[in-house]
């Protein structure tokens, strides 16, 4: 806190018997010119000093003892930084008292003193102006003109001093007022820069988001989508597998064929006889099947390995037109051949039977109907027929050599000329002619044309006679010819030259008992047989069907024998 003593005023009068107490040191301390010597006071003009006012401390008592006006002001600029300006105008009127003749000459002018006090603290009691008048009892000296001049000069000096100090103070405060707009401008600039930086950041963020979206779009547009269409090879494989599945699961007993109009040029026995077939231009053709087949019996149709497409027999005229015969071909496409030529067969284990069928249901019906003598008991069967057959694997390429050695014969040649069936090498295969040297004329010869191959559909329960596969004697257990028959539907070809038929119905019935050769599939190779499952010793073979009490538990439950392990 800075305190200044603003003014000290000397007394305008003089006291009797002495001069005023030295105000020169105080004025000199304030930088004011020292007042001149005051004249001596009149002996009768002295008055006692007034007592100090109430509530004043020692400072007021000291001020009262001195004949001057003390004005004290205090300012606090460091703590508050701002203050209130208050101008106080103090009017001091002093009326001299003394001799009567001096009162007329010594009229005192009113003196006006301007004092500026800056008060920075409202709570400070010392920052108040205190006016200490000289009092009415004081007498002025006798020389009024001189004192008035001195008082006027002192007043002017004080006024100029106060004005100069105010000007300095205002000049020191002006830079702060000038700096305030600059600070505001700087704040505005910083705010603008912040705004611009925020805008730039937002633009960068939006640009980055746009770039990311563009990148995503580019990546998604460049994804290689695999083609939805399958290749031709895959489609072919799908067709092949579908054909295989349909072939294995189908239960239709008949081969579909368009209605065939029998040729009127043929004899009646040829029309009404067993279904016949003829080979012409590499295709096997056949007529509609007779009533020998039972449509209700489930059996798969001709598989891809069994037959080529059949067509109806062409007229025996020499002027046959191939275009007319081609119209009778089946609408079904040529089935593809399966890669796997192995097929599971079921062999009858009854003594001196050895029948082989391609379905378990067929072999069971065969055993029930032929060997056990049970007809129509398939639903109520006790499962005894399961012990009389076993599974074998047969290669369907076994009949390759059989058809390769057979030359196709046209119907006109077969009707007009002698039998044209070639006899293959006996060292390589067994032919029907080699086996039928002792019996050239059989009941079958009455029911077939000269060299045409009879084709008939047969099923398991009809006990189709054994079919001889050429060159298969080495695979049979007893050294005799190994005979198999197919259920889908077995087709019997007889290559024995015979005379025209006389008894078609009887011959067709006897055909099932005396046929010698059956070729059921296009030839592709040799026969390879897996070791049959039932060839080893088993409880039912060792002890027989009569002694089931001696069988092992596995055999009782129709499982693999655990007592006689292969």
From Swiss-Prot:
Keyword DNA repair: no
Zinc finger (C2H2-type): 346-371
SMART domains: c-clamp (SM01366)
Record field: compositional bias (Pro residues): 32-55
Gene Ontology molecular function: cis-regulatory region sequence-specific DNA binding; zinc ion binding
Disrupted gene: phenotype observed: No visible phenotype.
GO biological process, one term: regulation of transcription by RNA polymerase II
Low complexity bias (residue ranges): 12-31, 56-72, 267-290
Gene Ontology cellular component annotations, sorted alphabetically: nucleus
Residues carrying Phosphoserine: 378, 381
The protein's role, per its UniProt record: Transcription factor which binds to RE2 sequence elements in the MYOD1 enhancer.
PANTHER family on file: PAPILLOMAVIRUS REGULATORY FACTOR PRF-1 (PTHR13006), ZINC FINGER PROTEIN 704 (PTHR13006:SF7)
Protein name, as recorded: Zinc finger protein 704
Organism: Mus musculus (Mouse)
